[in-house]
């Protein structure tokens, strides 16, 4: 959950503690393996180099989907004027549903996290040509989303843009099989700050939010 502030020529309001989720895409070979469809599901891409036997540095892209839940009841503070809608008014922690006519807000064309990492690998078990290693790491980068937002009667922005930054930590497990193959799983968590979100085709319309 997070607070999201929306600001423009005729409005400045914050919706408080609103819920969002990612968007999972059902697995099909076409959606996940066809290069022309690669941006439909969420994905991670990473390339790196071992500077020491157990230390690597890498560059990656995390293509995520962020979708604000519709029809949830939110508290709103601020004002909206001259929109020509029923939402004009002054709000003071007022309960208001996030309906389609008011707001649709998604980074569903990509909440793209362009990041750099450093990782340490620690082998803790080797048996019968199988090696088990733990992975820990830290990273940082910038956010390059394409936001699909519909705010009141405004046309949406349809461009990629720089919106903020992220920092993260990770841990994982690597199982190396006969030197040439491996299976790896990871858990990554972090903090994202988005102070410059483009919401509509008008450059004066912006939003900001932070979340873990």
Describe the predicted segments one by one.
Residues 46-150:
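Gram-negative (and chloroplast) outer-membrane scaffold detector with strong preference
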Residues 45, 116-118, 167-171, 187:
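Membrane-embedded beta-strands of outer-membrane beta-barrel proteins
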Residues 1-50:
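Short glycine/proline- and aromatic-enriched beta-strand/turn motifs that initiate or cap beta-hairpins
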Residues 20-28, 91-100, 146-154, 197-201:
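Flexible, solvent-exposed coil segments and beta strand-coil junctions
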Residues 39-43, 108-114, 132, 161-167, ...:
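Residues that define the transmembrane beta-barrel architecture of outer-membrane proteins
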Residues 30-33, 100-106, 151-160, 200-210:
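Extracellular loop and loop/strand-boundary signature of outer-membrane beta-barrel proteins
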Residues 4-5, 11-14, 19-21, 172, ...:
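Predominantly the C-terminal beta-signal and adjacent terminal strand-loop region
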Residues 3-9, 70-76, 145-155, 196-203:
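Outer-membrane beta-barrel translocator domains and adjoining extracellular loop/strand segments
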């Amino acid at each position: 959950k997070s607070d999201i502030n929306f600001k423009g020529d005729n409005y400045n309001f914050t919706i408080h503690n609103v819920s969002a989720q990612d968007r999972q895409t059902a697995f099909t070979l076409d959606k996940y393996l066809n290069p022309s469809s690669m941006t439909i599901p969420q994905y991670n891409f990473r390339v790196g180099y071992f500077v020491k036997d157990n230390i690597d540095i890498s560059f990656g892209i995390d293509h995520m989907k962020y979708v604000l839940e519709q029809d949830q009841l939110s508290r709103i503070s601020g004002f909206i004027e001259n929109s020509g809608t029923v939402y004009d008014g002054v709000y003071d922690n007022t309960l208001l549903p996030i309906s389609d006519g008011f707001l649709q807000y998604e980074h569903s064309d990509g909440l793209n996290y362009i990041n750099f990492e450093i990782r340490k690998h620690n082998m803790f078990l080797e048996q019968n040509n199988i090696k088990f290693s733990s992975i820990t790491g830290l990273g940082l980068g910038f956010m390059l989303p394409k936001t699909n937002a519909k705010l009141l009667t405004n046309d949406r922005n349809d461009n990629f843009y720089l919106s903020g930054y992220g920092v993260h930590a990770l841990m994982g497990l690597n199982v190396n099989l006969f030197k040439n193959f491996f299976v790896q799983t990871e858990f990554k968590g972090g903090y994202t700050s988005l102070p410059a979100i483009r919401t509509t085709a008008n450059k004066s319309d912006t939003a900001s939010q932070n979340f873990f």
